[in-house]
Amino acid sequence: MEQTGYREGILFLDEINCVSETLAPVMLQLLQFKKFGTHKVPEGWIIVAAGNPPELNHAVREMDMASLDRVRTLNIEADVTVWKQYAASRGVHPAILSYLEMKPETFYRVVEERKKKEFVTARGWEDLSTVLKEYEHQGLDINRYFMEEFIRSPEVAADFDAYYRMDRTCMGGYRISELFAE
């Protein structure tokens, strides 16, 4: 803040509900008085914190009543339509966008069975896009196992891999992803 000269902004604290028991009083002080030890958050700055629900992160600690009384909770759900707008603006791979257009139910899922967790997230799709484009650029092998590094559901990864292979095969001069492009 001092280096940039910004007089207002957002101080973002991620995974606030994973703070250790020893740091909890410091976080309470930060939330209540906008102070971290001897450092004060300047006027014009707000504190925004985020955390995942316990079912998605086993390191989550339930916040005590004093802390909860100082925060407002917004529950945010994954929305494929909103994400696709973001993804298009970020240049996410067209095969991913067209696949999700056809199969929006595969955008986000978390399944835990017999201590095995399978998940598909927005971060996974975006990371896949970044690496997929680079692999294509370098002519490297892309297969289902590659997809599973980012799409942590074997079923969805295999389905997307099949779609991707079909997309890479020109159909009448057009790729499937180009037919569904907006």
PLM region descriptions:
Residues M1-P25, L30-E182:
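C-terminal regulatory/interaction module of P-loop NTP-utilizing enzymes
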